[in-house]
Amino acid sequence: MSSTDMAVLLLVIALIFLIVNTLDNPLIMIGTRLIESTRVKVGPFIHVLERDGDRLFVIEPEQTLLYNTAGLIYYYFEGGASRRFCPVGEQAIVRIGLTDIGLINENGIYNVSCTNTSSWDLYEHFKNDSFEWKLPTFYEKTSIIDIINELIRYGYVRIGYQ
């Protein structure tokens, strides 16, 4: 082997090493695409139930409830928060109206109150006789505040002064 052949061989080996170890490796990209195509992707979506001018939003897969009536949004706390804020048999809810949004923006304090209407009873009330549809959310990671803002921005929630 001549020195030219050795140089070409070393160059080919270096190029193969470079191709295999780069981030934009076509083999790695194809493998990643194959793995991603086999995963089941269940993104969050919003199940909307409408009855008598009121709307109930069930955010899936967490099953968080937002109730929109009389120009207000009620966000139902679940689990431990209700037990800490309210007596036995009642659930904590956050009331959100235009004046409440102003107070939240000013000092970060939410209007939390208690109700004896459980989220399950409210869901059953709407499930029996209501018009329903689903809204997709196009973000993988969202918070309840992001979802409320999107619902207000696109007009799905009727919010006004009380």
From Swiss-Prot:
Read off the InterPro entries from this record. AcMNPV_PIF-4
Checking Pfam families in the record gives:
Baculo_19 (PF04798)
The record's comment on protein family reads: Belongs to the baculoviridae 19 kDa protein family.
Specify the protein name: Uncharacterized 18.6 kDa protein in P143-LEF5 intergenic region
Source species of the chain: Cryptophlebia leucotreta granulosis virus (ClGV)
